[in-house]
Amino acid sequence: MRVISGLARGTKLNSIESSSTRPTLDRVKESMFNILQNDIKDKVILDLFAGSGALGIEALSRGAKKAYFCDINSEAIYIIKQNLERAHLKEKAVIFKKSYIEAISLLDEKIDIVFLDPPYKLGVVGKSI
C-alpha cells in the first residue's frame, strides 16, 4: 500500500495485520481520488474506521487542509501515527482512539469530506451513515 499522488507520493504505508481489517486497494483508492481530485484542496477530511489511515493520508498528500482519523483499535492508531510520520503529514492530523459516535461528537469544525469504510463484520454500515 502506498500514497498514490501529491506531496507524499510513493510513500509506503503500513497496514494492520488483522482479519477484521482490510485495506482499501490502491486501484480503488486511485479511482476514488480521480473523482475527487478537484474537491480535496484546502478541505477538512474525516476518516472514520481509518485502519491504516490511507484514505486521509492520501487526501492530505493531495492538499487537504486537515484530516481527522478515527479508529477504536489500538493497533490501528499506532499504524496511523507511523504512516503520518512516514509521510511527513502529522502536523495536519488529529487522531481519535474512540468509537465513531464519540469522535463525531468531539468535532468542532465543519467537515467537508467523510471517508467511511467500516469493517463489514461490525454491522454498522447503515448506522454509521
Where are these regions (language model features)?
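Class I S-adenosyl-L-methionine-dependent methyltransferase catalytic core
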Residues: 1-129
